[in-house]
Amino acid sequence: MGRISRPRRGSLAYSPRKRAKSIVPRIRKWPQEQEVRMLGFAGYKAGMTHVLMIDDAPGLTKGKEIFVPVTIVEAPPLMVYGIRAYKRGYFGLETATEVIVPDFKLENYPSKRAKNVTFYKLLERRIKTLPKNYTEEVFQQKLGELEDLVKTGEVVELRALVATQPWLARIKKKPEVMEYAVGGTSIEEKFNYIKEKLGKEIRVGEILQEGELLDIVAVTKGKGTQGPVKRWGVKLTSHKDSKGRRKVATIGPWHPARVMWTVPRAGQMGFHHRTEFNKRLLRIGENGKLTLNGEKIEITPNGGFPHYGVVKNDFIMIAGTIPGAIKRIIRMRPAVRPPAKRPPAEAPQITYISRESKQ
């Protein structure tokens, strides 16, 4: 006789399945590293292709050529525009103070018609409370006050405030702003690292390394309102069932006299905040090009990536799929819980990259 019980359909781990608060994903946990570097980067999802590579992981195919799907994320340089200090509060970390750089002219703005475009002019599209009459003298004064707080030991954590530059990828004008933790053993070396980077661009090759494992944080592709069959995976009812088949046969007992939250119901599907762990970074490219077998090749396939176009900036190649729609902001950090049998830290040997049209 077969079993009369089974696991429930659909996981309750992510309930309530509602839309993310922001399209810019948040990162709450950071790896503990002794190397002084910014713990992560951000880019825009361009599309997918596939490569042939020599498998270097333990297994039956080690040393053989295997087929691997890859995702291309365009990663224009990030602008480090500020530093935020945290102190120990009653309920955890609290913001002690923050210092941002004064306004400056953007030399790399791609438009020929827009002259004298400043960083604040684009940043104020995202932050409405930028300071007025903020001079270099005021900036140096605030930076000195923050350095005094660091020396006294009142500051327990420092984060780098960065802004993306989507105009370099011809995606949009409004930047995304976010903060990143910095690795290191002391608060002083973290402060010196961010202080040196203030007002400067930081490239993905300075932060990430080929072959390392990353955690990908993004907002998934939205599907709108969907029924319980697609949203939760419940089985269709019998063909003799009345009033439809793509429904839940019973939504609960008479008492308690309400529908419980565990019952699979129709509602929002997709546009959820998700983190995927331990994605391998295969390659880092510069200016849309990659070195393969001793020659530079463009990563953009024939006809461009669908719904994206041509990759012209730095980019990263990640093994497998990642959440998010095309052109969506993708954040990444070094893996916080790498597997015990992790692949080699070096980049694998790639023998072929597909540049066939994806149209």
Curated annotation (Swiss-Prot):
One annotated GO molecular function is: structural constituent of ribosome
Q: List the disulfide bonds.
A: none
Matching Pfam families: Ribosomal_L3
One Gene Ontology term of the biological-process aspect is:
translation
Q: Does the keyword NADP apply?
A: no
GO CC annotations on file? cytosolic large ribosomal subunit
Region ranges (Disordered) = 336-359
Q: Which SUPFAM superfamilies match?
A: Translation proteins (SSF50447)
Which UniProt keywords are present, listed alphabetically? Answer: Ribonucleoprotein, Ribosomal protein, RNA-binding, rRNA-binding
The record's note on quaternary structure and interaction partners says: Part of the 50S ribosomal subunit. Forms a cluster with proteins L14 and L24e.
Q: What does this protein do?
A: One of the primary rRNA binding proteins, it binds directly near the 3'-end of the 23S rRNA, where it nucleates assembly of the 50S subunit.
Q: What is the similarity comment for this entry?
A: Belongs to the universal ribosomal protein uL3 family.
Per its UniProt record, what PANTHER family does this chain match? 60S RIBOSOMAL PROTEIN L3-RELATED, LARGE RIBOSOMAL SUBUNIT PROTEIN UL3
* UniProt protein name: Large ribosomal subunit protein uL3
* Provenance organism: Thermococcus sibiricus (strain DSM 12597 / MM 739)
